[in-house]
């Protein structure tokens, strides 16, 4: 079965429809009055369809725009962790360098002091 329903009538077709008269048939004025109500309903349905179609288009466009913004935001978020990682790595290297300077610098100072003492001791004996 087809999921899409097709509208077979429109307000103009309903208005132009003429019925044959038969003996003891329906009252033509009553039929016309009822068909006028049907026409108003069809017009209301068409207005609702037009409004909903416009809303649907507007919302579809909004979803597309938000998806574009989300994609752009995701690409920015991908760059930020790399920058943060680079900054963190730089900080770690800086701290490591300071620690090496502190630890090995003290040893170098001790070694330089010992070397100077030996040189001084050696020059005293000369």
Swiss-Prot record:
InterPro entries: Cell_cycle_GpsB, DivIVA_domain, DivIVA_fam. Transmembrane segments: none annotated. Its main location: cytoplasm. GO terms for cellular component: cytoplasm. Residues 35-72 form a coiled coil. It is found in: Cytoplasm. GO terms for biological process: cell division; regulation of cell shape. Keywords: Cell cycle, Cell division, Cell shape, Coiled coil, Cytoplasm. Divisome component that associates with the complex late in its assembly, after the Z-ring is formed, and is dependent on DivIC and PBP2B for its recruitment to the divisome. Together with EzrA, is a key component of the system that regulates PBP1 localization during cell cycle progression. Its main role could be the removal of PBP1 from the cell pole after pole maturation is completed. Also contributes to the recruitment of PBP1 to the division complex. Not essential for septum formation. Belongs to the GpsB family. Forms polymers through the coiled coil domains. Interacts with PBP1, MreC and EzrA. This is Cell cycle protein GpsB. It comes from Latilactobacillus sakei subsp. sakei (strain 23K). The gene is gpsB.
